[in-house]
Amino acid sequence: MTRLDPLADAMSTLTNGSMLGKREVVINIASKLIGKVLKVLKEHGYIDEFEYVDDGRFGKYVVRLNGRINKAGVIKPRFPVKVGEFSRWEKIYLPAENVGLIIVSTNQGVMTHREAKERGIGGVLIAYCY
């Protein structure tokens, strides 16, 4: 079976695993984008650690959860955002100010919306987590 959106599957796996109280989940399809998103989540304390496992097909990520994820999802369609427009999207996707993060793909890599604001660059919204 083909997966239409591996990032959406990964984010829903993280949300479901955290809601069920699991300590470890397996993301069945690995990609560079999923790896970069997991790295951002680890830097901000939403997951403990993750490991890439090569299974000879697509690869997998084994993620250790710490229970801090309440909701994680993708933003579709992937909206292009300028530097001054992040606050509008924060109100839509995050529950409160300074709670959670929006993950942005920029020309300088994948980062949070706060890092993009500090650097003064825009990008494309790809996911959120709180």
Swiss-Prot record:
Entries under PROSITE patterns matching the protein: RIBOSOMAL_S8
One Gene Ontology cellular component annotation held by this UniProt entry: cytosolic small ribosomal subunit
Any GO MF annotation of the entry: rRNA binding
General function of this protein: One of the primary rRNA binding proteins, it binds directly to 16S rRNA central domain where it helps coordinate assembly of the platform of the 30S subunit.
Subunit structure comment from the entry: Part of the 30S ribosomal subunit.
Family: Belongs to the universal ribosomal protein uS8 family.
Name the UniProt record assigns to this protein: Small ribosomal subunit protein uS8
Organism: Korarchaeum cryptofilum (strain OPF8)
Organism classification: Archaea, Thermoproteota, Candidatus Korarchaeia, Candidatus Korarchaeales, Candidatus Korarchaeaceae
